[in-house]
Amino acid sequence: MRFVDEYRGEPEAQALFSALRRDTHHAWNLMEVCGGQTHTLMRSGIDRMLPEAIGLIHGPGCPVCVTPLEQIDRALAIARRPEVIFTSFGDMLRVPGSTTDLLAVKSAGGDVRMVYSPLDAVKLARENPDREVVFFAVGFETTAPPNAMAVWQAKRLGLPNFSILT
């Protein structure tokens, strides 16, 4: 299975929209939460093909989509510094800045590492006292508690080489 081409055929799409029109008996509001989802819905015309009873609400966007370009460029500049271990969740590694992304900085020799938790970055700071460890703390309310815990833990452990970029 290719998982792309088989969903792009017009007859198949029309059959799905016919089924939606037939089976939609009350109003629905759907929120897309990522700018990429919104872009795809609009570009493909799905928003215009939905039954009138189905409304789309444009949500807040995911952190990857709404992080300002200037913030990504700041992250790239920090990640290039030889004294820095720059850490981030994996989804931010491919997000382009003005000229490049974090994976390209890593390929060029920058010490960029993917972590699964801000506490992984704290652990790196503890293991590398001679390097500044920076965690790229993008996100919303759901990521604030673990970020705060990482700052608290670094302070509790006396790690002056840990910081976050928000």
Where are these regions (language model features)?
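Metallocofactor- and cofactor-centric catalytic cores in central/energy metabolism, strongly enriched
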Residues: 1-130, 144, 148-160, 165
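Nuclease catalytic cores that cleave nucleic-acid phosphodiester bonds
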Residues: 135
